[in-house]
């Protein structure tokens, strides 16, 4: 049986986390040559490449499996052996969860457990991929099916409303939200792969993707600010703008129409006791504040 030296696995992990050999060497306090040598030893052991040497580097399928193994072992070692330093807990989460329910959910964990969070923000359609690559030990995703050797539980749903300020609505939709009016109304997306706004308009107004002018802003909080100041219309989780809706700073442009995103919590199996506490905290709070119907 091939048993890797965990020093070599840590070198592979550092190259992925630090997005290159130079920063990995600095992180491990060794030379770049030593980092390369350790990874080459690991590749020789398994008889195949474990790292695709692009910029930034990324692991091969076998490399992903080894990184997942390393992260599981680190969690289990922390549980049984303890440590003088907080354990790094890397999670892939979507920006809207981070802006709404996730941090309150993690409050008891951060208060009671010796951990350091490394939250990697990614669209909820792509967070599971980071878990598959071994970059994180847990992920909030819209995918209901678990990866091999992983566990999954349903958290609940975020309902997205199509909103704008009253002044924006008066300017762009004086006769209501129509197909022709939408073609002139500036919108906003999180990144070039964020298709929620386009999907909503295509489904409800038969507008083809790319037909609506759209800003790109990588911030959930900025969506709210842009909408409040009257410069865009956009899809925002109801949970994030309850106060703004109540005070009429924002209005629902299409009452009765919304986009629902069911969220799931994925993590490696078996869970350490520490990871089980993280799971319990996320599920307990998620079931309280997210839609369960």
Swiss-Prot record:
Domain HTH lysR-type: 4-60
PROSITE patterns (UniProt xref): HTH_LYSR
Pfam families for the chain: HTH_1, LysR_substrate
InterPro entries, per database record: ArgP (IPR017685), ArgP_gammaproteobact (IPR023490), LTTR (IPR050176), LysR_subst-bd (IPR005119), Tscrpt_reg_HTH_LysR (IPR000847), WH-like_DNA-bd_sf (IPR036388), WH_DNA-bd_sf (IPR036390)
Disulfide topology: none
Keywords for the protein's UniProt record, in alphabetical order: DNA-binding, Transcription, Transcription regulation
Positions of the DNA-binding region: 21-40
MF GO annotations: DNA binding; DNA-binding transcription factor activity
Family: Belongs to the LysR transcriptional regulatory family.
Function, in words: Controls the transcription of genes involved in arginine and lysine metabolism.
Oligomeric form and interacting partners: Homodimer.
Protein known as: HTH-type transcriptional regulator ArgP
Gene behind this protein: argP
